[in-house]
Regions:
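Short, charge-patterned binding micro-sites
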Residues: 29
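A C-terminal junction/extension of Radical SAM enzymes
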Residues: 168-186
Length: 186
């Protein structure tokens, strides 16, 4: 398997596409694992690109720094599950949810345009879990319920998606606390 693009190759690609592309989405894994991300984003911004960051919220201080430096135009943060099921859903037994909670609070303060999103898996998310997420992130922020899509990259073949009507029911549960809910991937 070939390694990913080197930073200089990525920047060369972006230089050639100025005026064609509007923005860059930095995704992962978890992009905030990389401590040198701000330098790369700064160069992207100098080229005139908008920058969106996809994150799981595990590194609130790094997120705050990037936002504070004006390097992010949009943040999409995954909410894996209700607080009580977060560790199991993330697949990390000793998962500490406090950093995620701090990132949620920071984004909800309105420091940068953002969305929350949850990829909904039948075996991991119940209606009660979805309701608890709604109580946690209650407000007018955009929240997307994304339908799970089985693939070769998902190690547990027993996982499955909810149907469209079921997803609509879950969205209705959320709308009491989070009116700006939309469905993706159906």
């Amino acid at each position: 398997e070939e390694p990913g693009l080197l930073e200089k190759d990525l920047l060369a690609f972006l230089r050639k596409r100025r005026g064609i592309l509007d923005g860059v989405c930095i995704s992962g894994g978890e992009p905030l694992l990389h401590t040198g991300l701000s330098g790369l984003i700064r160069e992207m911004k100098e080229l005139g690109y908008l920058v969106k960051l996809d994150t799981n919220g595990s590194f609130p201080e790094r997120l705050k720094r990037l936002v504070g430096e004006g390097l992010l135009d949009y943040v999409a943060m995954d909410i894996k599950n209700s607080k009580k099921k977060y560790a199991a859903t993330a697949g990390v037994e000793a998962f500490q949810i406090e950093p995620v909670e701090e990132s949620v609070r920071f984004l909800m303060e309105g420091n940068v345009p953002f969305e929350f999103r949850t990829t909904v898996v039948r075996e991991l998310h119940s209606g009660e879990d979805i309701e608890e997420i709604g109580e946690w992130i209650s407000g007018d922020e955009p929240y997307f319920l994304q339908s799970f899509e089985p693939s070769d990259h998902v190690p547990d073949l027993r996982l499955s998606a909810y149907g469209k009507e079921e997803m609509e029911t879950l969205a209705d549960i959320l709308r009491e606390k989070v009116p700006n809910v939309e469905l993706r991937g159906l």
